[in-house]
Design a protein with these regions (language model features):
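Catalytic activation segment of kinase domains across protein kinase-like and atypical kinase folds
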Residues: 61-115
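Conserved ATP-binding subdomain of kinase catalytic cores across diverse folds
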Residues: 1-43, 47, 57, 62
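Fe(II)/2-oxoglutarate
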Residues: 62, 131-132
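A general structural signal for short secondary-structure boundary/capping elements
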Residues: 125-129
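Regulatory N- and C-terminal appendages and interdomain linkers associated
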Residues: 78, 112, 132-175
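Long, low-complexity, intrinsically disordered regions
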Residues: 117-124
């Protein structure tokens, strides 16, 4: 279907039958490269952790969680926008890395296609050590299999959380 087929012209109106709208965002990796304000960086990394948690509580595992796959809006909200590798939470097996003194043990680890090792997330969600440390201090639970098992259990029970698009300070006071 072409664009022309979704438009209708009348004497005084242009009627758009079908339209996609995208929110303008800055890729999170570029934002973190350029931002120098520590408070804004911390807030963005907090939003990143919250975004991942909200996606998970919606029974979706985001798959490719590199920070380049997230964007930040002008209001400071972090939004996931790479849906290539998403799947349902129950389609993943969250495991702990085996404890070993052998530095080569990881090379011989048996891994099934749906296995996920949350302890590895810190190595690829964000790049710089400073960002990793901030993310771990705010959302260290994301790097544990226990957190992901808990989310899987909640999803299996049908527990649904309500998420608001803006934090409390930006919402209308209805009281």
């Amino acid at each position: 279907e072409t664009c022309a087929s979704s438009l209708e012209f009348t004497e005084s109106e242009l009627i758009i039958k079908h339209m996609y709208i995208e929110r303008k965002m800055t890729p999170l990796n570029l934002y973190l490269q350029e931002e120098t304000d520590e408070e804004k960086i911390t807030r963005a990394l907090d939003e990143l952790g919250l975004c991942i948690k909200q996606i998970a509580m919606a029974n979706i595992f985001p798959g490719d969680m590199l920070h380049k796959n997230f964007g930040i809006t002008r209001h400071g909200r972090v939004i996931f926008y790479d849906y290539d590798e998403i799947c349902l939470m129950n389609e993943r097996n969250f495991r702990s890395l085996p404890k070993s003194d052998d530095p080569y043990a990881i090379d011989t680890l048996s891994v099934a296609p749906n296995d996920v090792f949350p302890e590895q997330f810190e190595h690829f969600i964000v790049g710089k050590r400073k960002f990793k440390d901030i993310l771990k201090s705010l959302h260290g639970d994301l790097m544990t299999p226990e957190y992901w098992h808990e989310v899987q259990e909640k999803c299996a029970r049908g527990d649904v959380q309500h998420f608001t698009p803006y934090n409390a300070s930006m919402r209308f006071d209805r009281g």
